Amino acid sequence: MPCACNRNNWRKWIRPLLILLYALAILVTVPVCIWEFQKLKVGIHTKVWFIAGIFLLLTIPVSMCGILQHLVHYTQPELQKPIIRILWMVPIYSLDSWVALKYPKIAIYVDTWRECYEAYVIYNFMIFLTNYLTIRFPNLMLHLEAKDQQNHLPPLCCCPPWAMGEMLLFRCKLGVLQYTVVRPITTVTSLVCEILGVYDEGNFSFSNAWTYLVILNNLSQLFAMYCLLLFYKVLKEELSPIQPVGKFLCVKLVVFVSFWQAVLIALLVKVGVISEKRTWEWQSAEAVATGLQDFIICIEMFFAAIAHHYTFSYKPYVHEAEEGPCFDSFLAMWDVSDIREDISEQVRRVGRTMRGYPKKKCFPGDPDHNEHSSLLSASSQDSSKPSSPVGLYQGFGQTITSQSPISIANLYEEILNEIPEEQQRLYSGQDITMDIPEEQPRHDTGQDVVHLPYRQELPYKNHYQDHIQTVTSRYLLSSPKPSDDIVIDFSDSPEGSDSSTDS
């Protein structure tokens, strides 16, 4: 039974419902803040937490408005699903920092999960770009192969360039994916080190675990951002309709600013600007540094929410006729099967590469072809040299160049293999002639005719296109006038077949 609140009905009450929930949240949080200020002694910690709460209340509605509009106008799941995941970064960052600011003892546990989502956002931005390109250019691998070779950007400009095509796309995605894996691992490691008492957050010293984890996270994050930047550099013109610069800056600034300001605050602790002499209600200088970081993030997220609202706008996706039923878009927001499949595919490909197995071949005409499959075999391509646009594929078409000379006998065998076994036995040893009529085929007496739909691509049509030099094959591979059928005649007369072959 269809949902009673589908189409436009549920869109009429979803906005008032969220406004009501937001009003209830304000009615709960404001009295709590007032109660805190009614205490006999209100310190700097409480005042900072209260100011951060004001920015939180301003940030949440701006972010949720953008998320809600995408859910209401959920017409392009391939693009809007990663956008919604990116938009969730701002409220998660803001709420997480506000809670950590109020309860400093659990800050290490709360902040680590925030940092894990940071890696998730970077990868979703890469998915957003690749999904857009796949929609716009179904043969994306061919398009990349035809472009001029792109050298590495500084500081990796001395490294051998990645071959244009599948290798470039695979390594860029893998470079972003590694941060999605490294960040959760370092997060769990930091929690274990905190329990063991060897983490010592905010203290630059080679005797604690925090310093090493910061260096590892920094290198992993920088390489992920480098891969994103290289990917944008190669496909700058193709990505221009979605204005990727603003989107890239929104993601990059939130991630980079939050990370590097944490490093800067840690340096202030190291040089003594933030010291044990004045910690207010915090227990140590490191706790002061963590609280300062959380407070700044609460303020920054308000401006980030405004930037995200306009940069990742819902307006390009407003198509009333294509909007889905109730809750489908909401449930799709939590579906991570695409990420799981993509990670599994990347892991399998890395495993095949390490074991020396050849990569899977998947041609553009393959119905199972999608962005998670390897679209072009690069096993015969030198990874240190740029690929040529002329080779396995000619231009952007689907012509496949054969690597060995072809004879008429081979063509005969290929055609015969496509004929049912009964007719193979019946006409074994006879010559085959081909005819493509301009009008409807005529069924002559004494001939057996096998009809193949004209629009069905023959298996040998492309494979031998550049090698068969007979009149018959040239006539077959030319562009005939539209007709319903291609007729393959099995003639009993040897003279007809000889004339066809000799010509």
UniProtKB/Swiss-Prot annotation:
GO terms for molecular function: transmembrane transporter activity. It holds the Pfam family Solute_trans_a. Its main location: membrane. The keyword Lipid biosynthesis does not apply. Keywords: Membrane, Transmembrane, Transmembrane helix. It comes from the Eukaryota. One of its GO terms (cellular component) is membrane. It is a multi-pass membrane protein. The chain crosses the membrane at residues 17-37, 48-68, 83-103, 115-135, 212-232, 254-274, 287-307. Residues 373-388 have a biased composition (Low complexity). Residues 358-391, 479-503 are annotated as: Disordered. It is found in: Membrane. Residues 494-503 have a biased composition (Polar residues). Belongs to the TMEM184 family. Possible tumor suppressor which may play a role in cell growth. This is Transmembrane protein 184C. It comes from Rattus norvegicus (Rat). The lineage of its organism: Eukaryota, Metazoa, Chordata, Craniata, Vertebrata. The gene is Tmem184c.
